[in-house]
Amino acid sequence: MYFVFYRTNDVFAAEELLQNSGIKTEIVPTPVQDKAYCGVCLKISSHELEKSTVLLSNMDYRVVE
């Protein structure tokens, strides 16, 4: 599961928030060819999707499988 953000700063803010909540994340290149998104995103286990979505509810992102 990939959490794709518009700004790189949001990737790092989301990473910190999720890791502080016990969710393992990995910063990886964005798999989306859409130029609207920044070049990196967060890779998160699919079983953490619901918890991650709740924690990031105030951020602007897109989930890509």
Each language-model region and where it sits:
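Short amphipathic alpha-helix segments
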Residues: Y6-G22
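Short glycine-/aliphatic-rich beta-strand segments at the starts of folded cytosolic domains
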Residues: M1-V4, V40
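Low-complexity, intrinsically disordered short peptide segments enriched in small/polar/basic residues
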Residues: M1, T8, K24-T25, D60-Y61
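C-terminal structural segments of small proteins and small subunits
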Residues: T30-Q33, Y37-E65
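A short glycine-rich beta-strand->turn/loop micro-motif centered on a GG-aromatic cluster
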Residues: F5, K24-Q33
